[in-house]
A protein has these predicted regions:
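Amphipathic alpha-helical scaffolding segments comprising HEAT/armadillo-like alpha-solenoid repeats
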Residues: 1-12, 31-45, 64-79, 98-111, ...
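N-terminal alpha-helical scaffold/docking segments in eukaryotic complex subunits
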Residues: 1-53, 60-61, 225, 246-266
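Short inter-helical turns and helix N-cap capping residues of alpha-solenoid HEAT/ARM repeat scaffolds
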Residues: 16-17, 47-48, 81-82, 113-114, ...
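Alpha-solenoid repeat junctions
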Residues: 32, 59-66, 93, 97, ...
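TPR/Sel1-like alpha-solenoid repeat signature
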Residues: 59, 77, 92-93, 108, ...
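Long, ordered, amphipathic alpha-helical scaffolds
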Residues: 179-191, 196-266
Length: 266
């Protein structure tokens, strides 16, 4: 994109017309115009919730070179009146790796009234890489009144933040009364922390799953496969290919994801 086109988009950001602002933000993201971040930061204060949301989302992509400015500005949205804005601000903070936000995001995980925001918080804490959040994540994991999706994200993030020393505790959790989807996430977390035998257990769950649960497990397997520098999933779960092909045959909608996992683990 040439300089003149960029200037026109930046001018649109300064307009008072939300439609022009939204279109400009999206175009700046598509063109990877990182120098637009300071201009987009101003739109986090827009009276239009859709613009605040779009600006927060954009800064997750474009804010990495202005973290010291963008991070605090995004944190100001953590108490926004709109749950979609709060959720997007949390995710953008994770995208730019703004670790000073960890404590505030932990607070949202336990206290925000929106399950959407709590789910974003649980997921983002795993990406921010601060093990101090594990205790808060465990509280959400074990909270029987918590939304199931939030508990799933908490389990996954514990796997990202933990060490093998956590494995006995996670095994105890796995043997407790938990939703099956949360147990699947715990198996993935334990595998990532070194319990190699647990991937075969996860594949066994997949073999018996209905379509919705199969999709959930396929997402876990895809995530694990994408993280591995040296693929070991197929080695650790000898039945993986057979089960993936059976699932793809049983539920054709899952075929592309099954093939993706096979390609990643080849």
């Amino acid at each position: 994109m040439n300089k003149q086109s960029i200037e026109l988009l930046l001018d649109d950001c300064d307009s008072d017309e939300p439609t022009r602002q939204a279109g400009a933000i999206l175009d700046l993201v598509d063109a990877e115009v990182y120098e637009a971040a300071p201009k987009i930061v101003r739109l986090l204060k827009s009276p239009d919730a859709a613009i605040r949301f779009t600006a927060a989302e954009a800064l997750g992509y474009l804010g990495s070179e202005e973290v010291e400015t963008v991070g605090p500005a995004l944190m100001n949205l953590l108490d926004d009146e709109e749950e979609l804005v709060r959720s997007e601000a949390v995710e953008a903070l994770g995208d730019i790796d703004y670790t000073p936000a960890v404590e505030s995001i932990e607070y949202l995980l336990r206290k925000d009234p929106s399950a959407l925001v709590r789910a974003s918080a649980a997921e983002t804490l795993g990406y921010l890489g601060k093990s101090q959040a594990i205790n808060t994540l465990e509280l959400s994991l074990l909270d029987t009144n918590e939304d199931e999706a939030v508990r799933c994200y908490a389990a996954n993030s514990i796997g990202l933040l933990g060490t093998p020393q956590l494995l006995p505790k996670l095994e105890n959790y796995l043997n407790s009364e938990l939703p099956l989807s949360v147990k699947a996430e715990l198996l993935g977390a334990k595998y990532w922390l070194g319990a190699k035998e647990d991937i075969a257990k996860l594949v066994n769950l997949l073999d018996k799953a209905d379509e919705d649960f199969a999709q959930h497990i396929l997402t876990i397997l895809t995530d694990l496969a994408e993280r591995e520098e040296q693929p070991t999933l197929a080695k650790d779960a000898p039945d993986l290919e057979r089960v993936l092909r059976a699932i793809a045959n049983r539920f054709p909608f899952t075929g592309n994801q099954a093939e993706k996992i096979l390609a990643l683990t080849d």
